[in-house]
Amino acid sequence: MLKLIRPAIVMIVVTTAVTGLAYPLAMTGIAQALFPHQANGSLVEKDGKVIGSSLIGQSFTADRYFHGRPSATTGADPNDATKTVAAPYNASNSMGSNLGPTSSSLMTRIKGDVATLQAQNPNAPVPIDLVTTSGSGLDPHISPEDAYFQIPRVAKARGLDEAKLRTIVDAAVEPRELGVFGEPVVNVLALNQALDASMTQ
């Protein structure tokens, strides 16, 4: 009986040691040696303090900043732990809204967002990305069109010339990966950092 069980036990121990200990430690070591910034979360610092990550979006709401896409993430209700409340860009609870195209709640929210955005820039069509959530609710990027659409609002709030602001957005556009994969994007946190930096020059 023991002869039959022993190979199975040895296999379990070896497999656990290799896949549960050796492999993770090896990958962690390689990542820390070759890509320490990425391995530690691609954190963004300002004046020695972490202000975010280039991989996770955050909620910018002030008119003087560019805004990201809507986020459907939720968090615990501080008044009732058994319930949840809206908590945009909650990195501990990545999720979409799960609302389908026939959802009245989704349509009401989108119509409200469209009306708000049209009031800010009545001379341009509202980009669809600015009224739709990403699958994770944590998308750190917007399309260049999303950023250009927001220029009038940000320029007015900061008292900046729109042409100067467009130059800042142009510089923040990240091209396709290897010139082929994906679409050009703008990292919202990086753009807002560049915007703040331009005000001190």
Curated annotation (Swiss-Prot):
Q: What residue range is the signal peptide?
A: none
What terms describe the molecular function in GO for this protein? Answer: ATP binding; P-type potassium transmembrane transporter activity
Q: Name one Pfam family in it.
A: KdpC
* Top-level division of the source organism's lineage: Bacteria
What Gene Ontology cellular component terms go with this record?
plasma membrane
What HAMAP family does its record include? KdpC
Which family is this sequence assigned to? Belongs to the KdpC family.
Q: What does this protein do?
A: Part of the high-affinity ATP-driven potassium transport (or Kdp) system, which catalyzes the hydrolysis of ATP coupled with the electrogenic transport of potassium into the cytoplasm. This subunit acts as a catalytic chaperone that increases the ATP-binding affinity of the ATP-hydrolyzing subunit KdpB by the formation of a transient KdpB/KdpC/ATP ternary complex.
SUBUNIT field: The system is composed of three essential subunits: KdpA, KdpB and KdpC.
Mind telling me what this protein is named? Potassium-transporting ATPase KdpC subunit
- Name the encoding gene, please: kdpC
